[in-house]
Amino acid sequence: MSASKNQIAVTVEDYLKQASLRVNAALKKYLPAESEAPADLHKAVRYSTFAGGKRLRPALTLASFEACHGQGDSILLAACALEMTHTFSLIHDDLPCMDNDDFRRGRPTNHKVFGEAIAILAGDSLLVYAFELLAKTGRPECIATLARALGTKGMLGGQVVDIQSEGKKVGLETVNYIHRHKTAALIEASLVLGAQLAGAEDEAIAGLGAFGNNIGLAFQIVDDVLDLEQTTEALGKDAGSDLEKGKATYPAVVGIAASKDMARQLVDEAKLELRKLPIQSGILELIADYITTRVH
């Protein structure tokens, strides 16, 4: 029997909430206390890590692990590594030399509170902690997965093209390149890490990676649309900032209506491919649907 939209929403929200609680508890254990020296650096690290957020990437890691019948709590090492990596990217993305944003998750960005130097080091620290946690899994392939997602063929490569495209008229191919690398690569890694740590077969790992890349791109398309349609209060960051900065976004290239259609199509195709895999795909499909219906 199919669930109603309201039932689905509650199911997804409850799963994400429970995942967030698990990840937050683990992050508090893995990160140094604010009182530990150097205190200013650790305050900056925890300031951004515990500023809120959906914890979508670690939730996808947990969901992928469970879908592949993984057992045990070691998956929390990877889940926390993903959230640390994501937070590192946000801290650096907000810097004056990058996107120059003043607000993130409803409060001043890291560099506005601690200064640029400490913010850079806080981001660096989170990235180092992420790889330290992955090393504790004893699975070198997991370290390689995250490294590929972040490197010049991943997030960093996408960020470079994003910066170089500001204020320029670019086509859909360029926008796809930016966001397949800058955003989707890390979401893809979230799914792959869960499958790897569950001991999944290569077919499932590759399929979950492809699913992650497609829903990751859909996530970014929705983000671009929300930047134009939502308020600063709802987003927790400056609404309309992408348009103001001349960023390469989907609405700027194909319009809002076509952007929404693209996001839905990506998710629908991702779900169809997911159902071909020998895994329990239920919660992953619901999270994919949530990506296109979220309002912040």
List each model region and its residues.
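Mg2+-dependent prenyl diphosphate-binding active-site environment of isoprenoid biosynthetic enzymes
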Residues: 21, 31-274, 279-295
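N-terminal amphipathic/basic leader segments beginning at the initiator methionine
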Residues: 1-31
